[in-house]
Each structure stands twice: as C-alpha cells, then as structure tokens.
Design a protein with these regions (language model features):
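Long, low-complexity, charged/polar intrinsically disordered regions in eukaryotic proteins
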Residues: 1-2
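N-terminal helix-turn-helix DNA-binding core of bacterial DNA-binding proteins
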Residues: 5-41
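Canonical helix-turn-helix DNA-binding module
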Residues: 32-63
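Basic, amphipathic "hinge/linker" alpha-helix immediately C-terminal to the N-terminal HTH DNA-binding motif
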Residues: 65-84
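Amphipathic alpha-helical dimerization/coiled-coil segments
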Residues: 85-97
C-alpha cells in the first residue's frame, strides 16, 4: 500500500497536482505531454494519475483535452506547493543543505 499524506493523496499524486497548477499558472494550459515533460516521465504514465485525480474531483480531464484544476484541486495544489516551499526553506536556510 502506498503511503498517503494528510490530504489522502500519495506523494506522486501531490506532485502531479502541483505540476498541473504550475503549468496552468505559467502557461495557461496543461496537457499530458506537458506534464510528462515537466515530471520527466513518459506520457503513458501520466494518464492513470490524471484519471485518479479526476475521480477525486481535483481536476477536469478528458483524453486529448487540456487539463485544468477544479476549485478543490487548486486549494489542495496551493497547500502542497506551500508545504514544499516551507520544506525547501528549512533544508536550505536552516539546515544549510
């Protein structure tokens, strides 16, 4: 069984969600191939994650269409991104790693 975070997502799904949020914020659109490129994975491995995020009500996704966050997905993505930023600051500034 995969470990889940406090929001019920696996770390991998959290990372996909943040990647979508960053792509939409910076480029206005997210597609499977954009997500695959940003994550360094093959497009075929992105689709199952997108289906799961859609089932959870976090994204709007149809094959061969743009991917967008739902309002709930945006809230979760922002929280995860903020958490990542706090951890980064801690490791870099406090622990000097």
């Amino acid at each position: 069984m995969r470990a889940r975070t406090d929001n019920g997502l696996t770390r991998s799904l959290e990372d996909y969600l943040v990647t979508i949020w960053e792509l939409v914020r910076n480029r206005k659109v997210a597609r499977v191939k954009d997500i695959a490129r940003a994550r360094g994975v093959k497009p075929g491995s992105v689709s199952p994650a997108m289906r799961r995020l859609k089932e959870l009500g976090l994204i709007r996704y149809e094959q061969r269409e743009f991917i967008d966050l739902t309002p709930k997905g945006e809230i979760v993505a922002r929280r995860v991104a903020a958490h990542h930023q706090i951890l980064n600051i801690f490791f870099v500034d406090v622990l000097q790693m």
